[in-house]
Regions:
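Redox-cofactor binding/interface segments in oxidoreductases and associated redox assembly factors
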Residues: 82-84, 120
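Short conserved AdoMet
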Residues: 25, 77, 112-113
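Rossmann-like NAD(P)(H) cofactor-binding subdomain of soluble oxidoreductases
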Residues: 90-157
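Conserved beta-strand segments of alpha/beta enzyme cores
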Residues: 29, 66-68, 144, 150
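N-terminal glycine-rich dinucleotide-binding loop that anchors FAD/FMN and/or NAD(P) in oxidoreductases
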Residues: 47-67
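NAD(P)+-binding Rossmann beta1-loop-alpha1 motif at the extreme N-terminus of oxidoreductases
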Residues: 1-47
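Short, intrinsically disordered, charge-balanced linker/junction segments flanking boundaries
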Residues: 160-162
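Short acidic low-complexity segments
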Residues: 1, 63-79
């Protein structure tokens, strides 16, 4: 994949995903995807209620960089570099709830194409990416990991106000 061809989708526009997507938008065409329509509407109006991204920076990303936020999977289909940044909560027994992560993997599986890359930014225990997430992407997409698409894991190094 050539640098000039990169089109990024960040799945999950929370305290990790939104700052990351905003920063990516300064260099690459970037789409932020979230399941929460009210959150997407607020972001597209230039306001981040969580205050992770300064409203001025968000408005600049939208107006000058073409950054968009959406709940529409058709708008992320043309992307070729997917970053999954969804929460990984724990239950009362401190067991991780992979539901959001597996849902995001299904979303990626519905839109990923040959040659694309998916990077997992969510905090998970060792083995989750290859043993839990990528099989979902393979099953939904019909593509094969490391043959048709590629993946990585980025341990989170959160820097607020990017």
């Amino acid at each position: 994949m050539k640098t000039e061809d990169i089109r990024i989708c960040v799945i999950g526009l929370g305290y990790v995903g939104l700052p990351l997507a905003r920063l990516f938008s300064t260099k690459f065409p970037t789409v932020g995807f979230d399941m929460n329509q009210a959150r997407v509407d607020a972001l597209m109006s230039g306001h981040d209620a969580t205050m992770e991204v300064d409203d001025t920076l968000l408005q600049e990303a939208i107006s000058q960089n073409g950054f968009i936020c959406t709940t529409d999977m058709e708008q992320i289909r043309s992307c070729n570099f997917y970053v999954v940044a969804v929460p990984t909560p724990v239950d009362r027994n401190n067991h991780p709830d992979l539901t959001p992560l597996l849902g995001a993997s299904r979303t990626v599986g519905q839109v990923i194409s040959r040659g694309d890359v998916v990077v997992y930014e969510s905090t998970v225990y060792p083995g989750v990416t290859e043993e839990e997430c990528l099989p979902v992407v393979e099953q939904v997409s019909g593509l094969k990991y490391n043959a048709d698409f590629f993946a990585g894991y980025s341990p989170r190094a959160h820097q607020s106000r990017l």
